[in-house]
Amino acid sequence: MIAPGPRATDHDTDVLVVGAGPVGLTLANILGLQGIRTVVVEERDTLIDYPRGVGLDDEALRTFQSIGLVERVLPHTVPNQILRFMDAKRRVLAEMAPPDARFGWPKRNGFVQPLVDAELLAGLDRFAHVQVRWGSPMTGCREDADGVNVELGADGGNVGDGGGDGHPARLRARYVVGCDGGRSMTRRVMGVSFDGTTSSTRWLVVDIANDPLGHPNSEVGADPERPYASISIAHGIRRFEFMIHADESDEQAEDPEFLTRMLARMVPHPDRVDVIRRRVYTHHSRIAGEFRRGRLLLAGDAAHLMPVWQGQGYNSGIRDAANLGWKLAAVVSGRAGDKLLDTYDMERRKHARAMIDLSTMVGRVISPTNRRVAGARDLLVRSASIVPTLKRYVLEMRFKPMPRYEQGAVVHANPGRADSPVGTLFIQPRVDTRDQQDVLLDDVLGPWFAVLCWNNNPRKILGETAFANWKALGARFFALRPATQLHWTGHDDPDVVVVGDRRGDLKSWFDTHAESVLFLRPDRCIAGACIAQRAPDLSAALFDALTLTPRGGDPQSGTGSVLYVAQPAPESSGAVAGPA
């Protein structure tokens, strides 16, 4: 750690993000859209140019939609990708092909991570108040009551004191978020544990251009002789993964002849493939003891590591950014108290732990090398697939843990109710307004808080005081109606947007819930829900629980009044090869 310096009352930046990987870049885009001064520091000189993650889920795409970049990301994806689990004879044991898109996007998508990460980086060009500093490792930091003094390695850039001339640079930030991977320097500085296990099993991972198979889907081979995976990414790239046996060394596995033998099971000409990259790796199942300590926080691999079998490492990190980003923006802009940041650990830890456990369990199911154990597993899986409900359970990925916050930045009017929608993500159907037709709901709601009422005017339901408080916070208001009532003007209000239920999805949602008034957080989690008559009381409870301040804004920040930077019209762009 660096020695304590004089306490300053000003800050070089509001938030310092350590690490320019997908989590750090997503977080910086969220903060950028909210007008928060942000500096991203990265020890590398450029983005990592090889794939690591290979699957995006619907929640990640919804987050990219929220930062105005989904149209740039989509060209690098394979939507609705099917995953098949095969036995030793390459017969299908189980299949995952979830059909619904309740959050607006397909649940399974292959993608090319370097190209998607490059789009996230290019998105930061929209914000003069967001900077990226390459070749700038964080070497230490010290927190005081008002901020964090951070020391960067030589050539640490030109923000703050020093840097750019071979000497260490110092920056002062209100908060520091470590998105710096499994070997996180931020986590070490915080002094928190990283408990869990590292598997003794090793895998050879090979990325190949000009896909020798060419089909759009993926398979996992639960072959006791040698478990494997074959994954279609996008743009003609395929990943193969092969288990390395205990009596095989890393050197053997990295020999081209070894790869040729492995690929011979999959393609007719294994010696005629274009290898992009190969490496040997192991799986980790670990989680940090704390995601927050004072003004330092962790996200992504710095906070948790999980095996690859559910493709949730990348997506879990994007969930972290979506959960933390709006909370940091609210606190830094003076619209919420610092205690709101405590809810980040409360909400994300349980779900991250569930994803780690699921990924670890799936790895154990597919990778036994004992033939009797594998045979018993195959029999059990096939027997289960005969039962329609069990088959749908796997096919539709119903086993995937969904975020459901029982405590945190939520208010449960009836904590014991298992069917309460509070703490879950709201659906995202396609809707109509009087100005737009057939648009995704989030594009209507905007990037901040939203108050939704079915068949009612939010102002009348909330009352003038509560309505004014939400309006001062920057929230928007929506009256949800059947499409037949979209153009009826009898209850028009200049502060309320009328939304037409284009396909009946909204009514179907309200059909299954008693609540008719919803308070949505910026990450589209339902913070509170109630019947219309209880709305004023729930509104007051939410302001208290989330420590919200209607007319917030820190005069020292210079960003307190900025809650939304208008986005350009969505447009697809070509691949971005490196940092802008």
UniProtKB/Swiss-Prot annotation:
- Spell out the InterPro entries in the cross-references: 3-HPP/3HCI_hydroxylase, FAD-bd, FAD/NAD-bd_sf, PheA/TfdB_FAD_monoxygenase
Q: In which pathway does it act?
A: Aromatic compound metabolism; 3-phenylpropanoate degradation
Membrane-spanning residues: none
Keywords assigned by UniProt, alphabetized: Aromatic hydrocarbons catabolism, FAD, Flavoprotein, NAD, Oxidoreductase
Which Enzyme Commission number(s) are on file for it?
Answer: 1.14.13.127
Mention one GO biological process in which this protein takes part, according to its record: 3-phenylpropionate catabolic process
Sequence positions that bind FAD:
14-43, 291-301
Q: Listed GO molecular functions?
A: 3-(3-hydroxyphenyl)propionate hydroxylase activity; FAD binding
Swiss-Prot/TrEMBL catalytic activity: 3-(3-hydroxyphenyl)propanoate + NADH + O2 + H(+) = 3-(2,3-dihydroxyphenyl)propanoate + NAD(+) + H2O; (2E)-3-(3-hydroxyphenyl)prop-2-enoate + NADH + O2 + H(+) = (2E)-3-(2,3-dihydroxyphenyl)prop-2-enoate + NAD(+) + H2O
The cofactor required is: FAD
Family under the similarity heading: Belongs to the PheA/TfdB FAD monooxygenase family.
Protein's name in the database: 3-(3-hydroxy-phenyl)propionate/3-hydroxycinnamic acid hydroxylase
Where does this protein come from, organism-wise?
Mycolicibacterium paratuberculosis (strain ATCC BAA-968 / K-10) (Mycobacterium paratuberculosis)
